[in-house]
């Protein structure tokens, strides 16, 4: 479900300096909710909307979208992580600055109050509503690229089957958010992946069958059988050891070794176990419906 879309470009750091330079490439900032209820903050080139350069899953209150007050020559904004020195920078490409503040406020409201979003409401323009001829008028000394073609992509909403299976995943990720607080702390996988948090997910159709190849040979092929495994001391010890390995120095290398992508915008002090869970969330979201 598309939540908000508006024209914006990237601000890129000049190598070897702390200076930011506006990239003249025309783009969109898009926020949407995927089939699993995850909120994505994206930036994509206008002629390549299907492959966003930035695709960040944002959790409740972990970041803010703010105006760069130090910039006096243009309309610069940043996606800021209060617990980290890392931020992503953008510049507004709408012809008028009338809605700049409103866009920022809406982005922050979506980040902060994710559970209050009503999937049935969508009073925000989608990408396809914004395909008018661009007449960007900027006060910044930025070269304006030529529009080579008219875009025609749309961001679709999840179908009913995806919605029905998404709530369990959303609840599990909400538990991650509550446990960690996203303040640079670590999480304990034993607390996050305990049976009471997994039951709803395990009840989803097909989940048990997909887990069976990884269960001990004599495990009954039903919910009770899998719950017995995830309730066992051996499971807890394995999770504890894995959690310690992820949270150790260099533990994030385990994530890459497992074929999962790291989030470049993550707080550098964020524990490896939390980054591992976020990486799984991104993987599931991006591969939804691919099988």
Curated annotation (Swiss-Prot):
Residues 135-162 are annotated as: Disordered. It is found in: Cytoplasm; Nucleus. The keyword Isomerase does not apply. GO terms for cellular component: cytosol; nucleus; proteasome regulatory particle, lid subcomplex. Component of the 26S proteasome, a multiprotein complex involved in the ATP-dependent degradation of ubiquitinated proteins. This complex plays a key role in the maintenance of protein homeostasis by removing misfolded or damaged proteins, which could impair cellular functions, and by removing proteins whose functions are no longer required. Therefore, the proteasome participates in numerous cellular processes, including cell cycle progression, apoptosis, or DNA damage repair. Within the complex, functions as a proteasomal ubiquitin receptor. Belongs to the ADRM1 family. The Pru (pleckstrin-like receptor for ubiquitin) domain mediates interactions with rpn2 and ubiquitin. This is Proteasomal ubiquitin receptor ADRM1 homolog rpn1301. The gene is rpn1301.
């Amino acid at each position: 479900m598309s939540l908000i879309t508006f024209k914006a470009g990237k601000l890129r750091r000049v190598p070897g300096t702390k200076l930011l330079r506006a990239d003249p490439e025309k783009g969109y900032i898009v926020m949407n909710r995927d089939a699993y209820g995850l909120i994505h903050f994206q930036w994509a080139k206008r002629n390549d909307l299907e492959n966003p350069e930035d695709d960040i899953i944002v959790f409740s209150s972990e970041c803010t979208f703010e105006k760069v007050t130090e910039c006096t020559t243009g309309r610069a904004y940043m996606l800021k992580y209060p617990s980290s020195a890392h931020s992503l920078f953008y510049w507004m490409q709408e012809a008028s600055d009338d809605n700049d503040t409103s866009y920022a406020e809406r982005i922050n409201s979506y980040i902060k109050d994710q559970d209050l979003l009503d999937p049935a409401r969508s009073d925000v323009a989608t990408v396809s509503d914004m395909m008018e001829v661009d007449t960007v008028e900027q006060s910044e000394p930025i070269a304006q690229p030529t529009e080579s073609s008219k875009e025609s992509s749309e961001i679709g909403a999840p179908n009913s089957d995806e919605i029905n299976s998404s709530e369990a995943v959303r609840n599990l990720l909400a538990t991650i958010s509550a446990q960690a607080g996203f303040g640079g702390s670590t999480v304990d996988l034993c607390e996050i992946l305990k049976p009471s948090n997994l039951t709803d997910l395990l009840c989803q159709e097909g989940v048990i069958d997909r887990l069976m190849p990884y269960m001990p040979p004599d495990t009954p092929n039903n919910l009770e059988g899998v719950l017995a495994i995830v309730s066992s001391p051996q499971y807890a010890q394995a999770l504890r050891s894995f959690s310690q390995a992820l949270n150790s120095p260099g533990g994030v290398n385990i994530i890459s070794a497992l074929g999962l992508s790291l989030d470049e915008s993550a707080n550098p002090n964020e524990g490896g176990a939390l980054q591992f869970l976020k990486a799984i969330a991104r993987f599931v979201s991006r591969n939804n419906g691919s099988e």
